[in-house]
Amino acid sequence: MVPIGSGGGAVLRFLASMIDARAVVEIGTGTGVSGLWLLRGMRPDGVLTTVDTEAEHQRLAKQAFREAGIAPQRVRLIPGAALDVLPRLTDGHYDVVFADGDKTEYADYLAEALRLLKPGGIVAFDNALWHDRVADPAQRDAETVSIRELGKAVREHESLLPVLLPIGDGLLVAKKI
């Protein structure tokens, strides 16, 4: 697990701020680094819902949020697999969905994000370049193929306006129109 870098984090903060985000879903809590960036861009009353399979990750993230002075009511930590948790979240309720979880599930995360997002909402995927493997057709491992297919699906989706940002390991961002 490698946390998002400062460039990617700054983009997440900017995106959350730009759309005055009140409700954000994060897939892959990690140690809370990307969650802190998102929270810093959200409205003061905004709530981050963050999902991770690892209890230790969520414990570390909770500690990071507390140390950063984030009010406990602004963060909802949900343990579990994203594809078990996301279907239980409210349709059309979220302003941003950020995915940095299991790369082989990115296409499924996209389907859930489209359901969860309000019109005008933003979906973002970290590691969209996957160590420069996505552009190399000879690379056929499961993660690379999944991320490559995600890029194609986002580009071709009629209700998404996408951009691939060459920040860190690539940040694929799309607005739901």
Where are these regions (language model features)?
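Rossmann-like AdoMet
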Residues: 1-3
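S-adenosylmethionine/decaboxylated-SAM
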Residues: 6-177
